[in-house]
Amino acid sequence: MMLVFLLIRRQWRSASVRREEVIRLIALATEESYLAEEVRPATVDYGGDSVSDVYRCAVCLYPTTTRCSQCKSVRYCSSKCQILHWRRGHKEECRSPDYDEEKEEYVQSDYDAKESNVDFPSRGTAYESSSNVSVDVACDMSTSRPSIHKVQPRSEAVDFTTSLNIKDNLYETRPLSRKKSRNRTDKVESASNYSKGKTDAKLRKLGNQNSRRSGDSANMSISDQFLSVGFEEEMNALKHERITSEPSSASAAMSSSSTLLLPSKANSKPKVSQASSSGLKTSVQKVVQHFRPPQSSKKSQPSSSIDEMSFSYELFVKLYCDRVELQPFGLVNLGNSCYANAVLQCLAFTRPLISYLIRGLHSKTCRKKSWCFVCEFEHLILKARGGESPLSPIKILSKLQKIGKHLGPGKEEDAHEFLRCAVDTMQSVFLKEAPAAGPFAEETTLVGLTFGGYLHSKIKCMACLHKSERPELMMDLTVEIDGDIGSLEEALAQFTAYEVLDGENRYFCGRCKSYQKAKKKLMILEGPNILTVVLKRFQSDNFGKLSKPIHFPELLDISPYMSDPNHGDHPVYSLYAVVVHLDAMSTLFSGHYVCYIKTLDGDWFKIDDSNVFPVQLETVLLEGAYMLLYARDSPRPVSKNGGRKSKQRRNLAAIPSRKGNKKQRDGDNNSLLPRVDWSSGSLSSMFSSSDTTSSCSTKDSSGIENLSDYLFGGVEPVWKWDRHNKSQTFD
């Protein structure tokens, strides 16, 4: 009996459950049918100064806070309304919003637009169109030149009228706040408040009741269908954004069927009117977004180059053009220090440096409490200007290892190597005192503005025919003089000629993902203010020296060796210093350095350590020069290539004509260059210390393991290497 009773009770309960489910489904179907026939959009009147923040159910318009768990854009008061709305078609348009990590916003799209007329004020427009839209702009501005303007408080009014036509099925995207998503139906109000350059635009989805809002209001009449409009965050940040103003009578082609007018006056009230047919869904907010200035961050906008400069360009021009009197002076040889004496003499007569040091601009601001190369050099120059000669550079040479780790007192070293170490040391000092940081700041110190220039490198893979080009920072030029080369012009012509990279010198092609035969060409992109040319007289294979005469001019025109010879900038350089290596056996293990210096009066002097002799220009031009220093007639403007991440930086060494030298390969960067970060703190040398074999060196600087890879200047440290640098194609 008990078993029968339990079985009957179970069947009775099952029947009751089925009966309740049938009743619920009947009621739900009845409600759905009733709502489909009876629900009509209502007109909402605006009044007062506030708006209700109550969210409305998308079906019955009852106040609620529950929203769709997937799309986050609609709200429901109960599961019945959610099921009903899902069956009506929400399942076709419901999708998860896309999250943009950079902007920290959700982007949602699934709305259609048709026939909307919107008038609202604006001072500028930025266009982001997706499809089938036509924008016509008529601007009345103070200038017709396209430019980028920054919206500022109380800016001058810009009069323009914009016509926007939008057809059906316009698919657009809009940002939705992660924290705020407000929906209203049947009524839209758009208000824009312009106070001190701020723009406030809020478009909301309104329900079937009265709402209030502060500021200027606009009425919209809606019939035959719901109007879906999402909540938009305030646009007060527009005063920090840049907007693009199109020139007069500009137009962009997009198709459409409704008009959007933007009056020029900021005080005009927005007027919104809309007529929609059955099945229409639109979002006025998305229309407005076509006319919103693009949001920009400080990281994405390039900051002013003047703000990033380490050294004032105006001060640099004054120092470069300043005629400071300094008579030639001698330096005492402290034991195999002729190489250092010759280099210090050349630096002492380099115009920007000499003016900077004589005026005492460094010592007044130097923060170093210990030994400082620039301070000691300044002290030496001030003594020379006082008429003392010869002078002892003991305070500089006693700290040679602080200038170059491999340098030491009493050792015979290479003059070019010491020049690079000295310039590197000065650069590190100026960087520590620089008010700015970054690659462009490194290139705009006093040293960077003085010696820095740019090369244009082009490489073509012979396998896939892929071409790449990149600008490279240069600090000096090392050119080969072997073979039939008899003049500086011929050496520069060979330097800028095509070279085949084959064998051990093959180029790593990023497209082929392997080492391939390639053709390479280097040209001068921007000439430096002080051009240092090193004639490679020392041979790495037999430790010999090329003692043949090389003709070099007093005035050097580098336009034939520039990547754009038709460019308006045709710099002419004047010779002002020459370093000569004298030897008896034509070897790099012995010899003596002397230098020739030209004063501001145009007089030439030969300086041999402590001895100073006046000479004629003809005598200088007949010498077997090792290093040539040329000064540009007028300083060049700040480089347009400075600080770019897509740019390679290197201290320059030359590309030789010989094909048997080993190159350092770098497969990750499609390059043969080394990677050394200048900002790492271990500034061994800004230049390559090994691409030219020392003429007076010991085993510390002349060993075969230290000889250069001549193709890209060996394994010298570079200013700032970008590991993720990408090649740029060119025609």
Curated annotation (Swiss-Prot):
Q: Mind listing the GO molecular function terms for this protein?
A: cysteine-type deubiquitinase activity; zinc ion binding
Top-rank taxon of the source lineage equals: Eukaryota
What does the entry list as the binding residues for Zn(2+) 1? Answer: C57, C60, C77, C81
Q: Name one Pfam family in it.
A: UCH
* Zinc finger residue extent: MYND-type: 57-94
* Keyword Hydrolase listed: yes
| This enzyme's EC code(s) | 3.4.19.12
Function text: Recognizes and hydrolyzes the peptide bond at the C-terminal Gly of ubiquitin. Involved in the processing of poly-ubiquitin precursors as well as that of ubiquitinated proteins.
**Protein name, per record:** Ubiquitin carboxyl-terminal hydrolase 17
Organism, scientific name: Arabidopsis thaliana
